[in-house]
């Protein structure tokens, strides 16, 4: 009986992987985006393998089939500043000193944050990053799509990038990217931007059916 249950479970997992390819077809600016194409989907075992697969030059369909949690490397009593926008004291949002001169002459303070959020996961060319059901979560890090092309990100949730601090982290960063389709992506609890572009132009980018966080005020006034 135990062997039978194991076989059934293994078969179910294989079926989930086989059916977890990209759903739908990109359109408009994203029409030429193919990601990892028809490469056999595979799920990384842990955060180290996910990091490696995302960054390499191999075409891949990467299944996000569980929560990949990058939290745990805290910077304690690190340098931050108190910007003019923080009029709420301890209840407000201070800024992490990230070495670009943003804090300027603002009063300094110390803070504790998770280092993972400050730098996103590098994404190489020809990648499909696909969540499996509702399980696909990347916690503590965003995606950094810089100087690369042909990337699909679909059905994942990126969350918890130092939301209490300015410069806490970006969910998805594009810089010099080409042919990118971001679809059905949920973003929550980020300390800087949900989607951000850098100084280099990015071309043929399609955002569709994605869910940035909205407070009650914005939810009443914006269409998703």
Regions found by a protein language model. Give the residues of each.
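Fungal secretory targeting signals
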Residues: 1-20
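Acidic Gly/Asp/Thr-rich repetitive segments characteristic of extracellular carbohydrate-active
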Residues: 23-63
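Generic detection of short hydrophobic beta-strand segments and adjacent strand-loop junctions
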Residues: 42, 68, 121-123
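Acidic glycine-/aspartate-rich tracts in secreted/extracellular proteins
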Residues: 48, 67-70, 134-135
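Short, solvent-exposed loop/turn elements at domain surfaces
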Residues: 51-53, 70-73
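Short N-terminal amphipathic alpha-helices
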Residues: 64, 72-74, 96
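Short loop/turn segments at strand-loop or loop-helix junctions that form parts
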Residues: 65-67, 156
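Right-handed parallel beta-helix
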Residues: 77-224
């Amino acid at each position: 009986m135990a062997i039978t249950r194991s076989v059934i479970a293994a078969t179910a997992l294989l079926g989930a992987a086989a059916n977890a390819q990209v759903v739908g077809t990109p359109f408009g600016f994203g029409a030429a985006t193919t990601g990892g194409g028809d490469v056999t989907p595979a799920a990384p075992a842990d955060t180290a393998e996910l990091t490696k697969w995302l960054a390499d030059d191999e075409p891949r369909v990467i299944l996000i089939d569980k929560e990949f949690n990058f939290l745990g490397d805290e910077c304690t009593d690190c340098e931050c500043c108190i910007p003019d926008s923080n009029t709420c004291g301890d209840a407000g949002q201070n800024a992490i000193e990230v070495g670009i001169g943003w804090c300027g002459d603002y009063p300094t303070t110390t803070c504790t944050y998770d280092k993972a959020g400050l730098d996103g996961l590098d994404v190489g060319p020809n990648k499909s990053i696909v969540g499996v059901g509702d399980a696909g979560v990347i916690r503590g890090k965003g995606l950094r799509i810089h100087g690369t092309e042909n990337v699909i990100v679909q059905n994942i949730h990126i969350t918890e990038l130092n939301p209490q601090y300015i410069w806490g982290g970006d969910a998805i960063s594009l810089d010099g990217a080409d042919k990118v389709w971001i679809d059905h992506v949920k973003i929550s609890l980020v300390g800087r931007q949900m989607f951000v572009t850098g100084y280099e132009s990015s071309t043929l980018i399609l955002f569709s059916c994605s869910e940035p966080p909205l407070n009650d005020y914005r939810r009443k006034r914006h269409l998703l």
